[in-house]
Each structure stands twice: as C-alpha cells, then as structure tokens.
Amino acid sequence: MPSTRFMVFCCVAFAAPAANRLWSATTAEQSIKRVATLRAARAAHTATPLPSGDILLVGGMTESGGSLASVERFDPRDNSIHEVSPLATPREAHTATLLPDGRVVVAGGYNGAYLKSIEVFDPSTNRFRAAGSLVEPRSGQTATLLPDGRILFAGGVGTGWTFLRSAELYDPATGRSEEVGSMSVPRESHTATLLRGGQVLIVGGHRGRRQDMEVYSSAEIFSPQSRRFRPAGTLGTARHKHDAVELADGRVLVIGGADRSDRVYYRTTEIYDPRTGQFERGPSMASARYKIAGTTIVLPDGRVLVTSGAKTAELLDAAQGQFRAVRGGLPAALRFAAVASLRGGDVVITGGYDDANHTSTGVWRFEYR
C-alpha cells in the first residue's frame, strides 16, 4: 500500500448453484471509458452523489503517503471537474454519508492521527462546516444511514492501532454521537449493509496486523430498536477488504476480498438470506479482486456492476446467473477507488492506486443503456 498507516453503495434472483456448476464470464454490451482527470491523484477517498447530479470527491491519500484536504466535484453533464472549498482537516479512510436534505456528513479517518472530527458539506454553499465529533477516533469504520436519519458508525481502527468493536449513533440534527452496544469482535475492512426493516448487516473484516491478523467468517446484525448486535450466520470463506450490496429481493451479495496473507484474492461471492439467516454460495467472477469496499453498484435494472480491483469490470446477469466482462476497462487493478452512481444508471469510477502503489487521477464512466 502507499502507506502502512492505512491498512486500515426488475427483481434479482439467483438459482442456488449445484456443487459442480461452472460460472462463466462473457462480454456485456455496456462499456467503460475514461472521461476526465482529477486535479489531485487520490485513493481511499469518498465519492458521493449530490442532489444536483454532481459527484462530490473528498480527501484521500497521496502517492507519497500524505492525506488530502482537497475536494472536487464531477459534473456528469460535460464530464468536467471543479474544485470546491477544502476540508478543515485532511483525511483518508473516512466515511461520507448523504443525508436526505442533500448535505454530506464526512466523519473520522486518518491523517497521521486517528480522527474523531465530523464535517458537513452543504451543496448550496460548496463549503464544509464543523458538525460535532465521534465518541472516539476511528479510521476505516463503516457508516450506515438509518431510516430515522441517524448514522451508525461501526468498528475501524483507533488511537494506537487499536481495533474497535465499538459502535455509535450520530444524529445530524444535533451534531451529537452516542455509544451503542458493541460488536462481538473488533472489525476493520468489514462491510455494513442496510437491510429492509432498518437493520444493518455487518460481514467479515479483520483485526490485527501481519502475522497476528485474524480474518473473520462471522457476521452480525445491528437492531436500531435494541441498539445491540446479534449473530447473523457464517460465511463459507473468511474474508476482508470485500464488498457487499443489497439485491432487489432483499438478499445481500458479498463479493471478493482476501485471506489473512493479503496474497490470495477471491473471485467468489456469497449470498446472505435474511429470511434464513444463512449464507450460500453465489456465482464466481472471472477476476479475483480485493480492497473494493463501496465500489459495487446495483443498476436500475437489478444487475450488479463490480467496478474495481481488476482491470476489467464485470456485470452480474441475474437471469443467467453469471458475470459478464464489461468492454473497455481500467488501466490497472485499482485498489481503494471511489465509485458513485449517476441518475439514469451511469456509474463513475475515480482514483485508487495500482500494484506499484501509484495513485490515479483517472475518472471513468460506465455507460448504462
């Protein structure tokens, strides 16, 4: 990685695969092409769609290991990039959450210190303002907007490289955050997916570093009513640095990731069924990929677009139960890119870094039609 400090969103249905079924990848009609260049190369940043249709790109890490305060807006109407007022505090490995009123809550992260500060972006002024703080500093946490407007922050890494099992609820109306029940284990590089009914599914992740790392196959569910976590089934393969999205039928697709060595990447997927509380094997991708959290998009027609972690993006065709390669692609297997969907179904892929730890200024657009 560029920095050792950061090691630290029609109905879909899948037939349950037979044990000996082979999932193949063919070529989809859609394509990806480069459309713009960022003012600053960045990875471990965030990309958030605004009510105007623009994409807000916040912070991230540089190739030299620094953290960015710079912020850019991508205008999809002409594929242009515009600078906006910077963050008060440079940060990477933070979260950015779009509120119903169009503001964006940027929380936590790292810039040489683990951060607890929160800044809120107002698209009407193009500026950030301070908006309270987390209960404790955290980087690499997950952030999930709940139906009642509060944000659940779970896990991550805190001061002194402490892996966190704690969670907290932040209220944007008051700028205050409060602790809730903790997860069963400390987690970083996990995923958090909002389920129907307002519960949040936490999957996988790890604690520890290098030879002391433990990667989890466990999952748990947070209930806003009880403010506690409970067990929620077990993955067939322990994984971290993966991605997860809710499908149109309410199940959750868990994608890719890696083992504890970070040398074995997965092309496998698993599907969590909230009705049974169990995971089952899903279709496999053509390419193994990891460091992909937040880069998988469910398209308007229910297909699933997996964008980064490999040179070729893939589309999951639900009707045929297979992944299809997307034409065009990326120049490298970008890690920690940031991805957002546009109105009408197009998808924008930004930044990331390659296997040589070079951060990218690239902006690519998947054309949905």
What residue spans do the PLM features occupy?
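Bacterial N-terminal signal peptides that target proteins for export
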Residues: 1-8
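Kelch-like beta-propeller repeat domains
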Residues: 19-369
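Bacterial N-terminal signal peptides
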Residues: 8-17
